[in-house]
């Protein structure tokens, strides 16, 4: 079975695993009448179910913590989360491999092997989901953005990994823990502007002459819990601890827009299928045949991908021609 590789990207604690869990949980809720099915393999299902339980128990206390247990392990021990994609009631015809990894691989003390592991992910993966800790970006005028999100380090990684690209890539900036900043159109607009400013060097890199034709970049804020908002920052030994609170005592788990990264991913894949150049792009050469053989699957993917948001904090930063399917 053909596969598409996607990696999460971000330092420890920003919300990579939380984001992946929310994407998994909400797909079924948002698929609606679309004839698509996303089926995790047994191990992926078991792990993500455990993470989902953790995510929902954040609401057991009125003051919630910031996230769930992150990923741990050495490079050779890590596994990707594997989902089969196809029509409902049929065997999947494409595998989506989502790679998660410990954010500690970005730490100064990380071994060369761990650093190389992350670089290889960026080189090999079709799409990258950059999890952004929104409170660190937004609060106290972004005081903790560099400390938590490490934007310069992320930029340096792409400088190396995206040299001499021979095929298109999709980069998704995904602010998480962002419930507070999506309460109004004005605050959502400010969140988007802060993403542009906080990652300006990386966006400028993507906008360079060599990368502009090959990199599509979008912003998709994901409310991974939906019913908690940022409350305050406590500091201990100069280390920030972000605190959150439920919007009410009886608030329940209610994630919002967590399927949007997947919509953009499938839109990107569909465009590559349509593009006649894809036969010369090695990692995508199979796409024309994959969807070409199954009209109904193509229609289902197209329907799901058509609902990508582009306002109220969402934006297509560049690469419209890599995402335009009509």
What positions do the PLM features span?
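An interfacial alpha-helical scaffold signature
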Residues: 24, 325-326
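Acidic, Ser/Thr-rich low-complexity intrinsically disordered segments
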Residues: 289-325
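Short, charged/polar micro-motifs that form catalytic or ligand-binding hotspots
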Residues: 5-13, 89-92, 108-122, 144-151, ...
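Conserved beta-strand elements of beta-rich interaction domains across eukaryotes
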Residues: 13, 88-90, 103, 178-179, ...
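Conserved G1/Walker A P-loop phosphate-binding module
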Residues: 1-98
